[in-house]
Amino acid sequence: MNPIDTDDLEKHTPMMRQYLSMKAEHHDMLLFYRMGDFYELFYDDAKRASELLGISLTARGKSGGDPIPMAGIPYHAVEGYLAKLVQIGQSVAICEQIGDPATSKGPVERKVVRIVTPGTLTDEALLQERQDNLLAAVYQGKVGFGYATLDVSSGRFVIAELETKESLEAELQRTNPVEILYSEDFGALDLLHHFKGKRRRPEWEFDYDTSIKLLLAQFGTKDLHGFGITDARLSLQAAGCLMQYVKDTQRTALPHINAITRFNQTDTIVLDAATRRNLELTQNLSGGRDNTLAAVLDNTATAMGSRMLQRWIHQPLRDHALILARQTAVNELLETAVHESLHEQLKALGDIERIMARLALRTARPRDFARLRQALSLLPQLQLSLSQLSAPHTVKLGQLLGEFPQEQQLLEHAIVDNPPMLIRDGGVIREGYNAELDEWRGLSEGASDYLVQLEAREKERTGIATLKVGYNRVHGYYIEVSRLQSNQVPLNYQRRQTLKNMERYITPELKEYEEKVLSSQGKALALEKQLWDELFDLILPKLHELQDFARAAAELDVLSNFAERAETLGYTSPELSSEIGVKIEAGRHPVVERVSQTPFIANPVTLHNQRRMLIVTGPNMGGKSTYMRQVALITLMAHIGCFVPAERATIGPIDRIFTRIGASDDLASGRSTFMVEMTETANILHNATAQSLVLMDEIGRGTSTYDGLSLAWSAAEYLAQQVGAMTLFATHYFELTQLPELMSGVYNVHLDAIEHEDTIAFMHAVQEGAASKSYGLQVAALAGVPARVIKAAKHKLHQLESRDHQVEGTKTPIQTLLALPEPVENPAVSKLKAINPDNLTPKQALDLLYELKRLS
């Protein structure tokens, strides 16, 4: 049966009717339906949960004549199961009992109180501590795309107008959202295939006017001019859908989402999806974090600092003034050694950014308030450390940290030193904060003393030495007497419970005290919950300032981390130049040097207006790809304000970094290895400029030798002569080493190797000039190719080389070989090009068809 079909509800039991009605409202997610100490799932939800979570699938009787598939999880273990589900892109609606079973005549009243989706998480138990948790929405217009992202756990809201599908792919790669909303007629679904949390939304949720109203209501403004986004129509439509989705799932006010910013590609160095992937910035080719640039650079003290660092890595700046502000701050931190004390102070700060989001949503827990209290108490120490610094950017961050003495004092006075995890059982509000609460607690907590006194008094009054006064949750307070002595009890003793050898009684005095104590416990809990809610009201007026504090602390963390990395790893401050070029002396690959078992060989690179392309040759395993990647990574690091692994680096303006490195099939899109290679090459040739850094590795190897050589030659020639991009062009086509003789600005460099008998040693040092040979057979032998195969390959190689020598005298120069004649155009095609269909009569059109037939 389909649990969403509510047409025949009368066939079912009252409880199942209640369930089916709620499921119909949340048909696109799993429904956790609270029954006692369990959350139950039914029908298809039960089957899916059983499969995804590995829990037992059972049946719960029948409803409507059919067995009901059922699966359940204990309520106290729900967070662990939720974590598993959101990691695989599932959403869950949590339905709680809000009525009293004792007074309910039919099914207990229930209500969906919480919706958990991958992109709207704020609970720290469900979040990846050092990764942004982005919800995204994408909308396709007639021309271009609108893209919006929101991190509900921080309040960061960003939009982008993207002109091409390739730009959208790059943004998806950069932001890596955990949940994506897209419209019903979205035409680029192939870009979303590997994302888990995809949600198709109705077209009306992207309505422009509705979106504007939603955003204005959220920000409390009359218009959006102050955000500089009024012309971003498509991305505002995406933002509106996103905002509505968050309101529907959170079901509460969202005061921490108080601004929206626009991401402009012109402000940052453009990195397309292939470049981000090939350079392994924050994710390696296997999908993990090991051996990435982020893994090397990230020694941040806080999780919020780590997340900011990863955003910086994916958004290298173009504005030299902004970069220099960061560099100056890092340099001062390093020279004064203040980064050491800052690191320790920030480590104790915690993840204030996410704590503030939970506070804004009123889902913060007692320990969140305790952590906020600790963070505020550290502010004077932080400010003292910063007082030693004078760099303008650092001074500005110090001002943003702010001061919050009243809020700190409030939390010191209100919250106990080590609060419990949850408010529901009490014990969170400190004694002395509220006199009425202390009074109710005193009544409750004084029960033990009262019972001891009552027991002593009753023993003396009755003469029953074995008399005891006790309490249990079922029967409450009682006076216990052995059955043998029960005939000695006074007349005011009323029997409450009979046991095998004991009788339990209650007296009017004890009954009255019981009611008073139980009432005081309930009143104490209710008052404590009220005081807890009031704490939110007292802190929230400072929400914006506390968010500024969190952002400033995160940036200080990143900058002090850069200083520590520079000191520990031997990095130097790069020089930024206004002249186009990249000059690196003794550069090192930041990742490879950390994982290599042998000393890393540093290498230089020089690119400028008169030296725009390097043809890089050398053996496989010789280090060509490592060399090219290190140039790109050093350039990128310089543009995020980080010091770089080199003795010296001077880098001019860069608008884009392109890489065509490595090869793999794209099976999901039906593209072969060669097709992927050519698509990436086409993107580079179309979009590279004279200020771009281009890395091209082994172009043309996925097809026949002459096809591949022709493509590689033409691509290199186009980049050198038409585009003028700064290019490293690695190849095994030795014919390409003739390019420097044919055009200016092109130079050969190579990585060499030394042969000794049947072994080979790679030098990994870059030298001017072309390589002498490729050493392919030696590398194959190192890889373990059978000796018989290597021997046969050597024999075949000698045959081929001998044949080449025999025709040496008639050998055609490569430029002549590649200068193929232009194909002659078919006369029918020429005729078609000359036709103007608007000027033809029907008779002329028919005559023309016969003529075209003859010409073809």
Swiss-Prot record:
Mind listing the GO molecular function terms for this protein? ATP binding; ATP-dependent DNA damage sensor activity; damaged DNA binding; mismatched DNA binding
Q: Keywords in UniProt for this one?
A: ATP-binding, DNA damage, DNA repair, DNA-binding, Nucleotide-binding
Q: Does the keyword Transmembrane helix apply?
A: no
Any single Gene Ontology cellular-component annotation: cytosol
How far does the signal peptide extend, from start to end residue? Answer: none
NCBIfam families named in the record:
mutS1 (TIGR01070), PRK05399.1 (NF003810)
Q: What does this protein do?
A: This protein is involved in the repair of mismatches in DNA. It is possible that it carries out the mismatch recognition step. This protein has a weak ATPase activity.
Name of this protein: DNA mismatch repair protein MutS
UniProt organism field: Shewanella oneidensis (strain ATCC 700550 / JCM 31522 / CIP 106686 / LMG 19005 / NCIMB 14063 / MR-1)
